[in-house]
Amino acid sequence: MPLESGKLINDLRVSELKTELEKRGLSTQGVKVVLTVRLNKALRDEGLDPADHVFEHAVSPMKKSTRRSNEMARAAAAAAAEKVEKGAGDEGNDENVLVEEKEEEEEEEDSHDLQIIEDHELEVPSDEKDDTLVEDEEFEEAEQVEPEPEAVEPVVEEKPEEKLEEKPEEKLEEKPEEKPVEPEVVTVEEPVAEVIEVEKAVAEPVELKEKPEKEPEVVLVEEPVEQLENEPEVVPMEVEEAKKSDEQDGEDEFEEDDSSSDIEIIEPTLQESEPLAEEKVEKKEKKPEEIPHNLEQNEPISMETEEKVEEEVIILNSSINNVSQDDEIVLDYEEDLLEDPLDEPIEQKEPKAAEPTPKQLQKVEASTPQATPSKAASSSAGSGKSMLFGDDVKKTSIWIRGMTPATKASSVKQLASQYGKVIQSKIFNSKAADANGDVKNCFALIQFADVTAMELAMTSLHQKNYQGRVLRVEKVSESHLTSSAEKLAREKHVAEAASTMSTSPAPTPTPEPVVTTTTTTSAAPKRKEPIHAPESSSSEGQRAKRRAIEAPVRSRSRSRGGGGEPRSSRKPITFDREEESNRDSRRTIAAAPPARTSRMARSPLRAPLRAARGSESSRSSTRGGGGGGESLTISSRVDTSGCRGGAIKRSVERSVPNNISTSELRRKHHQIHVTVQQDAPRASYQTEQYARERSSSTTTSSRRRQVSPDRSEQRRHRDEPPPRRAPQEQPSRRRGASPPEPPRRQEGARRSEEPERRRLFDEREQLAHIMAAKDMYAEQQKIRAEKALIAFQMQQLEKKKLEAELQIAQKALLMQQAALGGGGALVVDGGALVAGGGAVGYHHQEHRSSYGGGGSSSNGGSSNRRRQTRRSPSPPQQHHSSSRRQRRDSGGAGRYRQSTSSSNSNRNSNSGGRNLVVTATTTNNTNATNAGRSYGIQSVPDASSYSTNNYQQRSSAASAYDLQITATMPQAGAANSGAAYHQPYGNVYQHNTAAYPVWGGLDAQGHMAMDTNWSQNAATPSTSTSSGGGGGQQWQQQSYGSNQHQHHQNNNSSQPSSSNRRGNDYGNYRGNY
């Protein structure tokens, strides 16, 4: 190639810029501007001038190489589009071109490199000119190149419309053309770089939109084609094998037909429409992404086929002619199970529909509990393996005991689904039947998806009440029912395989699996041999005896004679098997004995005999169906093993119907009596609670066996064990009970230590009653103490209330004394204040004569009488002569007579004793103690009955009198600090009262002071008195005035003295002293 003279940095192309950057070990990513800046910086670091530096590069024929590279790229893209079977459109560039375009666009957003442009001096106008020149050249060349993809496009677009009709020969012809083309695209580097510059303006906006679709197609061209060509049948065969094994495992609970199909079940539509060769060709042409999609499309078809197979499955006949066992066999040790035909199959449809991939199919295969051997796999499968439980299945499966025989697998599945995902639910019935031949118990086998759901179901369902029964849950790995179920499944599969080989024709390669199943199903009712569960070694002897005993039939002579009168001579009994249906119509009367006796210990000698009678009665009850369901079954025992007629074991009395022996009847009669009265007569100390617990389960009996540690310790130190009462002594201790029964042989009789356990149980109950009584007595004592405390608090409150009333009365008395001190006498009568002395007393006397009605109690009212009933009447008034003399000296004779007469008339008119005459006087000592004495007080009425409202409403005269009183009240209230309350009455307070007996009042506890001097010469104040601001009052009186009178008493109050009812009565009986 000729060398170019030289170029400046602005004249370099993108490829040349990248070459220069590669030489210097710098990054080549980014657009031309970024590359130029990066190279400019590198030149400056080397000490060169980027503007003057000249670069030398080889000149390459751009146009020819560009066209040739475009042709090669378009040819490679067309070939790739034909392989992938998709139209490529206008995309004609190579993969490397798209990768470089993408790198250039990503680097346009590089902000770090763009910031460098500001730091360097670039001639942007010269770059723009060069770019426009290059773009013009590229646009001209692109116009010349454009017609070429138009010729290729129709060929590419027609490929998807042919609908995969190519033959594999065409693929083989096209493949050699690809291999020489693709290495040319990879090896040629410079033309590819030039294509970017040529088609930058035209192809860039188109390829940017289609690039996300273009890139995955080019990447997937080679590898998927090689997989499909090199391994055309690997993936479909894996799916087919997984599906086959899943179908075999999915139907393991039933006796279904074992014929399976390989390819036909998965893709039945392809079989009908196209030959097998074309199907293999299409498998080669499929992409790996479409394989799961095809499985999802074909999945419902295979599921429908399996549903048909399950509908026509051979179901094991559950009504096997088995001989019923004894009703009283403990079910905890039951090992013989029968599978219920109404089991629910494994949940294999939902995992198939939701998880169609081969790995998930393998997981479902591993989780299935059984494996039904097919015709091809039955010979290869090991017979030693367990057909029902695997190690993984045992970890997630549980047994549920105690379900009713009518339980269905769907209901069990619904019950267990609330705790987690249920994979399988099966129902097993026990072979033990009752007297009517019905199944006694039902066992459910449930397999969960994980161990967490199984543990949650165990904790939730154990001891749960379901359909009237208590469920018991066990793990499959720990239950003995697992071995019985495995034996049953193994026996069933072996018998089913043998019957299938004998009844069905040889296997043919016909593709109709449903038809083969139908032929197997049609042969199911023709099988006469019952399939028995494997017998345990312990019950072989019982089964041998049970088969030997057969039910006797009615004799011909008895049916001919119609059961006539009994004959005197015995004759051999003959039987006719033709009339077997009419045999025991009168004999079968009742059902099984009560459930309580089923847990008792059984005698080993009588168990086979009872089993024989139970089986015989069950057969006779199913044939005859006579009687009711609440009485006892009575049957005779006939041994027909040796001869046709047989012999009756017991002695026969002809008077008894149906030749029932009397000894058997007597023994049955005792059992009937036992059912009515289950327990023997008990002693008097035994309670009814023991009878209830005695009839319950074994948990109560174990609780009764527990003895308290204290009693056990006491018993160890005793020399002799506690005496035991014999069972014969018990009836004698119970009075009024029914006569005792004769000693009888009954199974499950009480052990000898039963009375001792009863005594211990009752002693514990008595101790509990005593402790409860003690607790109740303690509670009652506590309640009594609380009541006493409440009563005491009420008395205290009442006491405080009386104290407050007395304090208010004291204040009122003080105000009355200050207002009426001139007269020296104060009469309080029914709410009316009467004062002696001057015109006031006269006016009031006039008022009393005019309104009192001549001694009538007009001012009392009904309220005074109501108050009279509440308190005891006050004693009659007693005035000492000294007090009368004091009144005469202080107030004058005339005024004294008026006030006394008015008070006497009021006292006589009001018979209720509600008049209170207060003769008050105070003294002002020189030492300023101001301890005013009050005496002559009668009773202490309530303030409510002496309100002045009634007094104010009587007349205008009464109101005028109140005004006279209230006119003096402010003056009295203003003079509450010194000697006299009012100046006009100052002489009264200066009067000497030392000669009169004075009572100091009650102390703080409501009692009379011990230091009170009752002599006339010594009137020392009591230690309990207290002096207030305006003179301490030792007697506290009820408030008789209105709120006006009480308003001025605030500063004269002394501390209240405590008083109770007895202290309050001192005012009644000691008021005159």
Swiss-Prot record:
Record's protein name: Pharyngeal muscle protein 2
Annotated source species: Caenorhabditis elegans
GO BP: digestion; regulation of mRNA processing; regulation of transcription by RNA polymerase II
Pfam family membership, one: SAP
Biased composition (Acidic residues): 91-111, 128-151, 223-232, 248-265
Tissue: Expressed in most tissues including the hypodermal, muscle, neuronal, vulval and intestinal tissues. Isoform a: Expressed in the pharynx, nerve ring, intestine, neurons and ventral nerve cord.
PROSITE patterns in alphabetical order: RRM (PS50102), SAP (PS50800)
GO molecular function: RNA binding; sequence-specific DNA binding
Source superkingdom: Eukaryota
